[in-house]
């Protein structure tokens, strides 16, 4: 599988570089022959996919069709680790993904893994949209050769389990699946649970076979992964926001004309606002499905 992913990334890189380097003074014109690339590790029918596709639409609209972008969803060209690495080294120009896997490469992003820092999504969004705060966060990304264009979200992460949770003591001993993030693991350990990093593709079977007792994810993922079929309770822990970053390789961005940079920046903001609206609608819809 790694060989296949490597080949795909190499092919995509060749097209992207042709689009950007063939006429370095005017990448937008070159992009008419070869589309730019944006990738994520989620299905198209998720907020991540919506965020990605809206950006593609907005870039094409704002450029009057002069700039074309090809979206690769669902980990087609690699999982979270491969995507952030590929964006940092310039193989893939644009990436949309959760910030948690990025903290393994950009340690300062662990600020977003501080549990219980926010319990209201609107307060969090106001912070993320603050120009001064975003400038500081962007500097952290720039230290690692990528630029933060916009930050959306899938609301908060919540817990599902077959055990009724009424107090902190009820978390003790619960074998809960988490992402591979040391800060997430530390949080669950601190309240007595037994966190187990596991690929999401293994979660449904893990719950079915009893390898794990519980898991934590945004509502949308609980529904799309049919987790509710194996779990009796949703515990509204809201312990962490599920943030979605849209990043671009800094060298790629710097080769764009001033006009195209403005198009990219505005398209990212438009996609952020639209995806947040869709997220809020989908939370209500997903809750009705779970109930």
What do these predicted regions represent?
Residues 1-35:
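Short, low-complexity disordered leader/linker segments with a strong preference
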Residues 137:
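Thiol/selenol-based redox catalytic cores and closely related redox-interacting motifs
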Residues 21-123, 132, 141-291:
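N-terminal secretory/targeting leader peptides
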